[in-house]
Amino acid sequence: MKVGIVGAGMVGSCAAFAMVMRGVASEIVLIDRNEKLAVAQAHDILHGTPFAAPTRIWAGTYADLADAEVVILSAGVGQEPGEDRMHLLERNAKVFGAIIPSVLAHAPDTILLVTSNPVDVMTDIARRISGLPSDRVIGSGTLLDTARFRSLLGEHVGVSPKSVHAYVLGEHGDSEVLWWSGANVGNVGVQAMAAQLSRPIDAAARARIDEAVRRAAYRIIDGKGATWFGIGSGLARIVQAIATDEKALLSISARTDVCEGIPEVTLSVPRIVGAAGAGAPLVPNLDDDEKKALQRSAEILKEAADGVHI
């Protein structure tokens, strides 16, 4: 598979590195307005290929995106310490207006994978600018939040996060919804499993985990300015599912009508991801509080997206 990455900063380059380590792409082309940066990142990653999967990686131009099956959009201005993701909207929407036509001029059949924040609204903007079907314009969404949730649950219970099945829904941001009622360890509800292992999840533990998931990005940004390793790994995971037509269930952002009372909104619910992009969504069986929270998240995103005129 050939993958293009527009934006060779830390997120884009970490995604490229993670794909090389996973061996999910045969070709990766990095594009950045700072050509010197793109060349440096490509060379640095290339020098690691002898220790990983053989991958052709280089810095190029939009013309080099020809035949790319996936193009990752990681270009945009970064999130400042303490800045809400939604505040990034107007600045990054302008960036996409310039980038996407250039991408599609050379890769009209590609799947666009958006990671620029605020990712849910930016995914919707990318869909509107591109005119592509919604299954071919997907965002990283709450994939990273879901990984954080699983990691913290696994740590608390004392099992591998790979054995934890839990999802974060809605916005990748402040209104996200931790789907506690649907969380399992193996095939056992997380609360029941935690009790069996004498590691109960009481109100205090639940609040601690909830807060840690929600505030993780802000704490990382406060310490080093941005997040990149986790999201880079998540992007590689999405590309892997597309490359292998895996039909993996991943919490990605795409256009959906699963929220009652809101015909269509771009947010995260678990979706089947394969060669065609975003497949059918899993309609979550939520408790009353979770339903209200997801509805509120959808309303926030809908209002933000509708406020942007393309």
Enumerate the predicted regions with their spans.
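Conserved N-terminal Rossmann-fold NAD(P) cofactor-binding segment
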Residues: E27, I31-E69, E83, K302-I310
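Aromatic pocket-lining residues of Rossmann-like dinucleotide-binding sites
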Residues: M19
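C-terminal substrate-binding/catalytic lobe of Rossmann-fold NAD(P)-dependent dehydrogenases
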Residues: S130-R136, T146-I310
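Rossmann-like NAD(P)-binding element
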Residues: P50-I111
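Rossmann-like NAD(P)(H) cofactor-binding subdomain of soluble oxidoreductases
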Residues: R85-R150
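N-terminal Rossmann-fold NAD(P) dinucleotide-binding loop
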Residues: G12-S13
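Glycine-rich Rossmann-fold phosphate-binding loop(s) that bind the pyrophosphate
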Residues: A8-G9
